[in-house]
Amino acid sequence: MSIRVIIAGFKGKMGQAACQMVLTDSDLDLVAVLDPFESESEWQGIPVFKDKADLAGFEADVWVDFTTPAVAYENTRFALENGFAPVVGTTGFTSEEIAELKEFSRAQDLGGLIAPNFALGAVLLMQFATQAAKYFPNVEIIELHHDKKKDAPSGTAIKTAELMAEVRESIQQGAADEEELIAGARGADFDGMRIHSVRLPGLVAHQEVIFGNQGEGLTLRHDSYDRISFMTGVNLGIKEVVKRHELVYGLEHLL
């Protein structure tokens, strides 16, 4: 039996890529799409909803969310309340919101996934960086995205820093008496690590994790040149969350 999928934010670039992926997979069935600004009532024969409240009680298994940080938490909560296992690629969640959604998913006996990045290479980058941080505590992150991205730093950069902080010796990166001649020049501070965000047209999603030690350096980098790179992870997420009973944060938990 096919997994019935709702896609929220279907008009965006990620939403459109997700729609095409679902439509070409015989194991998946796109049963509804959501966008508050869509004027048509159907898209390729699929019902279009403008208000998520109208989807309450709808027959579906999975809610895929590529909307905006402003509504992602409410959408995920709504999905869980209505029996849809959420697969969320929208970023901007606080740690408190993620913890609350995990607890609520267990109460609902529903699987779910919030993933800062669906590209398998990016997930591997985070794992490799975590291993390296045990031995190279001096590290900085540079994340680069298209100029339409609304949050900074990226969810991938934050997740990478969180994972490294769990194993890394907690030290302040840079000179103890350094002075910023322009505010923000050294980037955001996460547990002593610096995170730098670049926003330029022509980019999609890229990240470097740069480690330094006496007489040597190590650079890890991942590049997504096209949004199709995320669809393997989205597909995996859809097929895995229906088997599970709680929400997880990070695609690595499903690999």
UniProtKB/Swiss-Prot annotation:
Q: Name one GO molecular function term.
A: NAD binding
**What is the protein's major site of localization?**
cytoplasm
Lineage, top-rank taxon, reads: Bacteria
Q: Where is this protein localized, as stated in its record?
A: Cytoplasm
Q: What's a Pfam family this protein contains?
A: DapB_C
The enzyme's first-digit EC class, named in words, is oxidoreductase
Q: Which Gene Ontology CC terms are recorded?
A: cytosol
Entry-linked InterPro entries: DapB_C, DapB_N, DapB_N_CS, DHDPR_bac, NAD(P)-bd_dom_sf
CDD domains from the xrefs? Answer: DHDPR_N
Which Gene Ontology BP terms does the record give?
diaminopimelate biosynthetic process; lysine biosynthetic process via diaminopimelate
Report the active site residues: H145, K149
Binding annotation for NAD(+): G9, F10, K11, G12, K13, M14, D35, G89, T90, T91, A115, P116, N117, F118
**Residues that bind (S)-2,3,4,5-tetrahydrodipicolinate:** H146, G155, T156
Metabolic or biological pathway, per its Swiss-Prot or TrEMBL entry: Amino-acid biosynthesis; L-lysine biosynthesis via DAP pathway; (S)-tetrahydrodipicolinate from L-aspartate: step 4/4
Q: Cross-referenced Gene3D superfamilies, in alphabetical order?
A: Dihydrodipicolinate Reductase, domain 2 (3.30.360.10), NAD(P)-binding Rossmann-like Domain (3.40.50.720)
What Enzyme Commission number does this protein have?
1.17.1.8
Family to which the UniProt record says this protein belongs: Belongs to the DapB family.
The UniProt function text for this chain reads: Catalyzes the conversion of 4-hydroxy-tetrahydrodipicolinate (HTPA) to tetrahydrodipicolinate.
Protein's name in the database? 4-hydroxy-tetrahydrodipicolinate reductase
Organism encoding this protein: Streptococcus pneumoniae (strain Hungary19A-6)
What's the encoding gene here?
A: dapB
